[in-house]
Amino acid sequence: MTSKLEQLKQYTTVVADTGDFDAIARLKPVDATTNPSLLLKAAALPRYAEHLRQATAGSGGDAGLACDRFAVAVGKDILGVIPGRISTEVDARLSFDSEATLARAHRLIELYDEQGIDRERVLIKIASTWEGIRAAEILEREGIQTNLTLLFSFAQAVACADAGVFLISPFVGRIYDWYKKSENRDYVGAEDPGVQSVSRIYRYYKANGYKTVVMGASFRNLGQIEQLAGCDRLTISPDLLQQLADAQGELPRLLLPGEGEPRQVLDESTFRWQMNEDAMATEKLAEGIRLFARDQEKLEYQLATRH
């Protein structure tokens, strides 16, 4: 019998959620995603020492530029061993500034262009704030495709679809974490709030004909992945990918298009109110931005203090 990973690939495009080149080469995903936290981990790997040196040397003392150059160097390496796209993230500290997000996205695309990488192979990752979604809407019109991340609520998903973004990354595990702590109980299978969130978004998109790709992210266990077999894409850590590769048994497609809610359009005030009313999404979005910003600052410090 084929492994659960091979069975999953029959229904869903599998993406590696890592900056670890060796893991990607071994597990052979279609796409890969990175973020400041993953890049900080990658910076500790010996194989990236030269990339760190070159990123610093070519940045004129600008630590933010050095981080972007390092992210692009890692992305270029990864693109050498996958057939699809790399997602590279805009500095999370710009999450509430549309103009600054646009400028940083343009810089990342220019850096990839300097490395001979076509923009068709790059997704610009942006936090799913109102300002981030507006920036993504403009980038999509310019032919720069985007991945809207830190997505925890239906309101965020509705706004992203209306903006015509290429792909969203609704988080499963972090939603699960919040409800597990808040309700002081565990969740398994289809009752998992993170699984339910992605399933609802997926069915809404399919029922209303949206082309935006749904890529489930942030998994805590194989059960969550198995429940979402059939989602457009799933981005999975190397550890869980390896567990899937080692696992035998049937893995049926459990997520199918079905009856979805009617099409909605949210203006800014309605979006903000719906986010305000969703304590989990409000807390997890803010926390996610803080964590990515912290790791961005750590990576900048590491690059700025290299000798």
UniProtKB/Swiss-Prot annotation:
The biological pathway it contributes to is:
Carbohydrate degradation; pentose phosphate pathway; D-glyceraldehyde 3-phosphate and beta-D-fructose 6-phosphate from D-ribose 5-phosphate and D-xylulose 5-phosphate (non-oxidative stage): step 2/3
What are the catalytic residues?
K125
Q: Does the keyword Cytoplasm apply?
A: yes
Gene Ontology MF terms in the entry: transaldolase activity
* The protein's Enzyme Commission number: 2.2.1.2
**Superkingdom field:** Bacteria
Could you list this entry's UniProt keywords, alphabetically sorted: Cytoplasm, Pentose shunt, Schiff base, Transferase
Q: Which Gene3D superfamilies match?
A: Aldolase class I
Instruction: Write out the GO cellular component annotations.
Output: cytosol
Q: Cellular location of this protein?
A: Cytoplasm
- Signal peptide range equals none
Which GO biological process categories is it annotated with? Answer: carbohydrate metabolic process; pentose-phosphate shunt
Q: Does the keyword Transferase belong to this entry?
A: yes
**Catalytic activities:** D-sedoheptulose 7-phosphate + D-glyceraldehyde 3-phosphate = D-erythrose 4-phosphate + beta-D-fructose 6-phosphate
Q: Which PROSITE patterns match?
A: TRANSALDOLASE_1, TRANSALDOLASE_2
Q: Which family does it belong to?
A: Belongs to the transaldolase family. Type 1 subfamily.
Q: How does it assemble?
A: Homodimer.
Q: Which HAMAP family match?
A: Transaldolase_1 (MF_00492)
Its biological purpose is as follows:
Transaldolase is important for the balance of metabolites in the pentose-phosphate pathway.
Protein name stated in the entry: Transaldolase
Organism name:
Pseudomonas aeruginosa (strain LESB58)
Recite the lineage of the species.
Bacteria, Pseudomonadati, Pseudomonadota, Gammaproteobacteria, Pseudomonadales
